[in-house]
Amino acid sequence: LSAKEFDEIIKRIDDSECTIIDVGSSNIEQFLVQMNEYQGSHDLIDYFIVPVVREAKQQIDSIQTITTLMAMGVEQDRFKVIFNLAEKDTPINKQYSVFLADDVCKEIVGENPVVVYHNNIFNILNKSGLQYDDVYNDNRDFRSLIRSASSKEERQDLSNLRAVKMLMNGFNSDLDVAFKNLNLV
């Protein structure tokens, strides 16, 4: 749905027990305009999850989004910030320094930041033509399969699949920690 279809968004919120509204960066301004026109509509939303990336301009945009929503009456404790596409080898406070320089945003983040680290899993899946669910649910014993493979090509294919599975396992573990740190009720 487009942000302009705000009445339909409200209906869908009311039609379900739990709704996640993903407002892309290209729709955020229109979404905020509509939310302001439909006064009190922010009360239909339990949490506002704000993904923040490393680029300074986007960090400034995220601060502005939070500021605008707070001016509409959204309480500070209803915000959840996700530091997205973070690098594991650089401290979070350096990667997101613009965002964390804002006192309100820093307070929202708290002591246990929610972090989703950059990972090449989706590029690898795309290049190899593999589906996320297929790899995720593949519980074969790759070690045994590789040892019993009848050709070098089969061993390489199985070894590549195992490497993708291992990368996905690491990514999923990071997501589990991030979800836990969201502290959703």
Can you describe what each PLM-predicted range is?
Residues 99-158:
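Beta-strand-loop-alpha "switch" segments that mediate conformational coupling across diverse proteins
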Residues 52-55, 78-97, 114-132:
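G-domain G4 guanine-recognition motif of GTPases
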Residues 11-18, 32-56:
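Inter-motif core of Ras-like GTPase G domains
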Residues 34-35, 59-67, 90-103:
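Well-ordered, non-membrane alpha-helical segments in soluble/globular domains
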Residues 2, 24-28, 57-62, 171:
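Phosphate/oxyanion-binding active-site loops and adjacent basic polyanion-contact surfaces
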Residues 1-28:
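Nucleotide-state-sensitive switch-loop elements of NTP-binding domains
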Residues 38-42, 54-88:
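Conserved C-terminal guanine-recognition region of P-loop GTPase G domains, centered on the G4
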Residues 154-185:
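C-terminal accessory extensions appended to soluble enzyme cores
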